[in-house]
Amino acid sequence: MGSKGDNVAVCNMKLERLLSMKGGKGQDSYANNSQAQAMHARSMLHLLEETLENVHLNSSASPPPFTAVDLGCSSGANTVHIIDFIVKHISKRFDAAGIDPPEFTAFFSDLPSNDFNTLFQLLPPLVSNTCMEECLAADGNRSYFVAGVPGSFYRRLFPARTIDFFHSAFSLHWLSQVPESVTDRRSAAYNRGRVFIHGAGEKTTTAYKRQFQADLAEFLRARAAEVKRGGAMFLVCLGRTSVDPTDQGGAGLLFGTHFQDAWDDLVREGLVAAEKRDGFNIPVYAPSLQDFKEVVDANGSFAIDKLVVYKGGSPLVVNEPDDASEVGRAFASSCRSVAGVLVEAHIGEELSNKLFSRVESRATSHAKDVLVNLQFFHIVASLSFT
């Protein structure tokens, strides 16, 4: 049996030292469980293109490199595909304007705990000893210089006025920390009996909303210092259609149903103390459009070119939807790929395995409901800096 008391209390630990999608290339890794994110990203490429059209092009004789950043890049191939798309689109704009394209630089940024090694192994080789035009025309090669930048995007990461374009997808719903009041048993916001805020009390969800808005304010403040005049940002995060923050939409179904029930199973079986369960909270908040807009407006540095709720679809990729066991495995793997690192830090590897085994079993028993109802909505924001 795993230890009940010796593991890390995730709520009390700085998340940036710990939080990451599951690294490597195993069955439960993010690299092998991010196909749905890839499909959602592809469905939004037309919105990304619109944002890229708003970026100012430097037409000077010797322009500096065009610099793009993916914030919250994680460790799968999706970030590489997005950067490739950005570089090629901007290059086409230079060509259409009759301007020689500059060199391109891309920064992949995530928390220090991110598996950058797996990410860098996915990068195609850089075309060398040739001109930029030939680089951009080469298939299967990279036409931009790269670097990894570890650190929280809720703080400054780059020198002032050095970035042309920021991209961040499926990351801003992750909070910098679980609000302290949520894990304080003396607080009215204490999230007793739950590991997520879906269906929680008003004071609990208010604490999460305040944390999200404070984090987003810090994010915008940092980017406003780093982006060049005429630069832009394309941001995507989990969102919700309900005005009620206790209804967290797809995130609520992912973390507030079978995942929650699996924790309760461990408590009933005496494997985890109720207090230990209550000390674990998923640091995710799916905002409404109004939640998001209030922060952008208050910051005042960015013009909102587009701000919409976009239906992304299911986070699961299932080849045989009639196979309940495959649906259950996909659900459990999806949960584990994004939350497994936190769970294991909180209760240890052995109990973590037991937890996700129960998640899989419960999702298998409700496979049809999972396929029909587990749908994600995203907040999509196109912002420009002038």
From Swiss-Prot:
Enzyme group, top EC level? transferase
Example GO molecular function term?
indole acetic acid carboxyl methyltransferase activity
Tissues of expression: Expressed in seedling roots and leaves. Expressed in the stigma, funiculus, and vascular bundles in sepals, petals and stamens.
**Reactions that this protein is recorded to catalyse:** (indol-3-yl)acetate + S-adenosyl-L-methionine = methyl (indol-3-yl)acetate + S-adenosyl-L-homocysteine
A Gene Ontology BP annotation from the UniProt entry: methylation
Task: Tell me which residues bind substrate.
Answer: 30, 33-37, 170-174, 334
Q: What is its EC number?
A: 2.1.1.278
Cofactor binding, per record: Binds 1 Mg(2+) ion per subunit.
Q: Name one Pfam family in it.
A: Methyltransf_7
> Which residues does the annotation say bind S-adenosyl-L-methionine?
30, 72-73, 78, 108-111, 152-154, 169-171
Q: Where does Mg(2+) bind?
A: 191, 195, 277-278, 280-281
- Tell me the InterPro entries matching this sequence: MeTrfase_7, MeTrfase_capping, SAM-dependent_MTases_sf
Which keywords does this Swiss-Prot/TrEMBL entry list? Magnesium, Metal-binding, Methyltransferase, S-adenosyl-L-methionine, Transferase
Needs which cofactor? Mg(2+)
Q: Quote additional remarks.
A: Plant silencing IAMT1 are smaller than the wild-type, show epinastic leaves and smaller siliques, and have low fertility.
According to its UniProt entry, the function of this protein is described as:
Catalyzes the methylation of the free carboxyl end of the plant hormone indole-3-acetic acid (IAA). Converts IAA to IAA methyl ester (MeIAA). Regulates IAA activities by IAA methylation. Methylation of IAA plays an important role in regulating plant development and auxin homeostasis. Required for correct leaf pattern formation. MeIAA seems to be an inactive form of IAA.
Q: Give the UniProt family note.
A: Belongs to the methyltransferase superfamily. SABATH family.
The record's note on quaternary structure and interaction partners says:
Homodimer.
Write the protein's name.
Answer: Indole-3-acetate O-methyltransferase 1
Source organism per UniProt: Arabidopsis thaliana (Mouse-ear cress)
| Lineage, broadest ranks | Eukaryota, Viridiplantae, Streptophyta, Embryophyta, Tracheophyta
